[in-house]
């Protein structure tokens, strides 16, 4: 016998049927798509020259059209449909002014009128706030690393770090050939354009280097210039005879200054293929620091900074040679792993403040933090420092007084100096401060030295991992951030150091 439903059950049944009906009705209704129109950027920046192009992407739910105000630029296309469309903007004229120029704007609207967007168009000034040069002379076994460095730079540029500043890359593809290219930002990507190709290059000659930088000044003029130099490095040591010949390596003696090198520190490769970096590529194709200084002086440039992506270039002898062509030297007193600087991390700091400035703290910190973790536990080695070149001559005056007041340096076997390489015998590079502390016992002079060292190589920029790499991990027990060859008994040092500007200024 079926029991009659109570009023409560009837209410529950009816409620469930009503909910089911509403759900089915909602599922059958067609969902109306919300009208939308977006652009990848609200400002397009054209380079300063006529014909330069920049792009942005339009994403739309329906047909759209574009109108412009202002002038001095062309746009294509001016309409599109559903989906994504790339719009290209082209400069009609050069911007000959010294400031960014507002050319106009583009108004985009859906055909239904339900959404719109505006993109402004500006043109970079004829003279950039800064131009950074990535200088990569032929360095043999580092070429593939240079290509990786450039790819890392492109990652940074794709983040729109340049703004109105410019970045050019000089890259040698062989001992005699090379090219000059500009990297720039466009629509979320890094693009490049070739500015010039070179044949029969000899970058060991001052005239060649001057010619390269004269062209850069002409093509990418700027209020300020910075440069990164990637290659193998050997501090101030003359290009001729900078390495050890095979016979010398076996005999444990140093070659004469004119010996053609056959064995270099970067040729000591670890079992898993790791090696390090020299300012040049070996033998007669290396560039002396004095030659580079002569060339840049002739080009009429004083860099804001020279960032050496090379071994041993944080050297007081090097700093003295280059003091008049740069405000700062960013370098390592020891070897740099062949990978070099992590440019995807470093480049944003070289284009700080909207591309107009640079952040030395950020550069040093990003280098240090990268190498703290680099291929641990065998190769997490790195050291960096910044030398203030305007303080180098004052440091030379202090050092001259110390030399005049001190007897000749005699090594103390109980207190070995902090050395920065272990592949040449005798060692060529030692920590400057450690050397001075053992050379001089005059308290007043040492206090003066400490104070001047703090101004010349500021402590906040002296960063290093626990070890540096030189044929293996080597401990850092004291670190002033800068080396000297003064205490070295190496033949190449003894035969040449008295010809350096630093030696002449301090003796």
Task: Enumerate the predicted regions with their spans.
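Sec-dependent bacterial lipoprotein signal peptides
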Residues: 1-26
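Bacterial Sec-dependent N-terminal signal peptides
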Residues: 22-45, 74, 107, 113-127, ...
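Surface-exposed binding patches on compact interaction domains or structured appendages
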Residues: 36-39, 43, 59-88
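A short beta-strand micro-motif common to beta-rich folds, especially ectodomain repeats
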Residues: 87, 98-113
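N-terminal extension/subdomain marker
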Residues: 125-222, 498, 503
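Structural recognition of the beta-strand scaffold that forms the well-ordered cores
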Residues: 131-136, 166-171, 225-229, 304-308, ...
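Catalytic-core segments of thiol-dependent peptidases
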Residues: 171-190, 197, 201-299, 310-311, ...
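Terminal, contiguous helix-loop blocks that mediate binding/assembly
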Residues: 255-507
């Amino acid at each position: 016998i079926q029991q009659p439903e109570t009023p409560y059950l009837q209410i529950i049944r009816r409620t469930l049927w009503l909910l089911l009906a509403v759900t089915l009705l909602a599922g059958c209704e067609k969902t109306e798509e919300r009208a939308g129109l977006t652009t990848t950027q609200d400002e397009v920046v054209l380079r300063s020259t006529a014909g330069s192009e920049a792009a942005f992407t339009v994403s739309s739910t329906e047909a759209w059209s574009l109108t412009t105000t202002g002038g001095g630029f062309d746009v294509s296309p001016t309409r599109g449909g559903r989906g994504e469309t790339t719009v290209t903007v082209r400069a009609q004229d050069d911007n000959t002014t010294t400031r960014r120029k507002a050319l106009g704007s583009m108004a985009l609207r859906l055909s239904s009128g339900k959404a719109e967007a505006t993109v402004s168009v500006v043109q970079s000034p004829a003279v950039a706030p800064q131009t950074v040069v990535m200088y990569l002379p032929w360095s043999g076994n580092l070429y593939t690393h240079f290509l990786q460095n450039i790819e890392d730079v492109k990652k940074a540029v794709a983040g729109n770090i340049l703004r109105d500043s410019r970045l050019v890359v000089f890259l040698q593809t062989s001992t005699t050939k090379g090219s000059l290219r500009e990297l720039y930002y466009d629509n979320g990507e890094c693009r490049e354009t070739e500015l010039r190709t070179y044949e029969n290059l000899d970058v060991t000659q001052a005239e060649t280097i001057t010619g390269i930088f004269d062209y850069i000044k002409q093509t990418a003029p700027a209020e300020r210039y910075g440069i990164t130099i990637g290659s193998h490095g050997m501090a101030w040591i003359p290009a001729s005879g900078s390495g050890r010949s095979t016979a010398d390596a076996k005999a444990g003696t140093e070659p004469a200054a004119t010996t053609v090198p056959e064995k270099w520190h970067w040729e000591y490769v670890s079992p898993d293929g790791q090696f390090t970096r020299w300012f040049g590529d070996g033998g007669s194709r290396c560039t002396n620091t004095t030659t580079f200084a002569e060339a840049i002086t002739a080009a009429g440039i004083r860099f804001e900074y020279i960032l050496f992506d090379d071994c041993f270039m944080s050297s007081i002898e090097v700093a003295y040679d280059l003091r008049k062509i740069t405000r700062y030297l960013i370098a390592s007193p020891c070897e740099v792993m062949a990978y070099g600087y992590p440019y995807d991390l470093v480049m944003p700091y070289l284009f700080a403040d909207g591309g107009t400035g640079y952040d030395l703290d950020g550069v040093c910190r990003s280098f240090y933090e990268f190498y703290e973790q680099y291929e641990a536990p065998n190769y997490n080695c790195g050291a960096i420092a910044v030398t203030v070149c305007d303080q180098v001559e004052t440091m030379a005056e202090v050092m001259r007084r110390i030399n005049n007041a001190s007897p000749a340096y005699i090594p103390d076997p109980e207190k070995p100096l902090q050395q920065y390489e272990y592949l040449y015998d005798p060692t060529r590079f030692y920590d400057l401060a450690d050397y001075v502390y053992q050379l001089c016992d005059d308290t007043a002079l040492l206090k003066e030295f400490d104070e001047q060292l703090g101004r010349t190589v500021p402590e906040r920029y002296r960063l290093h991992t626990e070890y540096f790499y030189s044929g293996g991990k080597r401990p850092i027990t004291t670190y002033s951030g800068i080396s000297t060859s003064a205490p070295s008994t190496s033949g190449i040092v003894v035969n040449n150091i008295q010809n350096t500007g630093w030696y002449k200024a301090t003796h």
